[in-house]
């Protein structure tokens, strides 16, 4: 495979992610929630009563901390998230989904699931397993590269 074709593969991956996110956001627009906000809410809902730190969301999704702070602020303003200080460390806050968010959960899951089903339509279970395996391999290859660039950034 040529370098040009490798670049196309990455562009196509990016395009798939962007378009999928836009499709989900359009479905959720009547609820005034974006795809990213929906994924954050579902993450909080799935973590239930123990709460979640902003850094946990950062690790799970890879969004920058400032971006996440803005998203969490908007979701708090809409009444979907509440924050409590951590016991023993007032600087850290645990985030919880509210009952209002819990009521949205079925529709969030339905909207995201509908887009995913359309995206994977026509794939056999074996093809999906292969795709998953290859994506995991890409992520494993990316991990050391990310650590290298983070070290370089911290030096400057």
Description of each model-found segment:
Residues 1-5, 125-156:
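C-terminal regulatory/oligomerization modules of transcriptional regulators
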Residues 22-64:
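N-terminal helix-turn-helix DNA-binding core of bacterial DNA-binding proteins
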Residues 1-31, 78:
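N-terminal leader segment of winged-helix/HTH proteins
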Residues 6-10, 34, 54, 65, ...:
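Short, structured helix-loop boundary elements
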Residues 13, 41-44, 135:
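Hydrophobic structural patches
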Residues 16, 20, 61, 104-120, ...:
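Alpha-helical linker/hinge and terminal dimerization helices associated
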Residues 73-133:
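Charged, amphipathic alpha-helical coiled-coil/dimerization segments
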């Amino acid at each position: 495979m040529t370098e040009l074709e490798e670049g196309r593969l990455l562009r196509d991956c990016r395009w798939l992610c962007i378009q999928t996110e836009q499709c989900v956001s359009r479905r959720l627009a009547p609820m005034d929630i974006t795809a990213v906000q929906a994924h954050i809410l579902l993450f909080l809902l799935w973590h239930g009563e123990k709460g979640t730190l902003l850094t946990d969301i950062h690790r799970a999704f890879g969004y920058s901390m400032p971006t996440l702070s803005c998203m969490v602020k908007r979701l708090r303003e809409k009444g979907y998230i509440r924050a409590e200080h951590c016991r023993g460390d007032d600087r850290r806050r645990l985030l919880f989904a509210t009952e209002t968010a819990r009521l949205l959960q079925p529709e969030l899951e339905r909207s995201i699931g509908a887009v995913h089903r359309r995206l994977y339509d026509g794939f056999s279970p074996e093809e999906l397993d292969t795709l998953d395996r290859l994506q995991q391999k890409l992520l494993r290859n990316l991990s050391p590269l990310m650590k290298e660039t983070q070290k370089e950034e911290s030096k400057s």
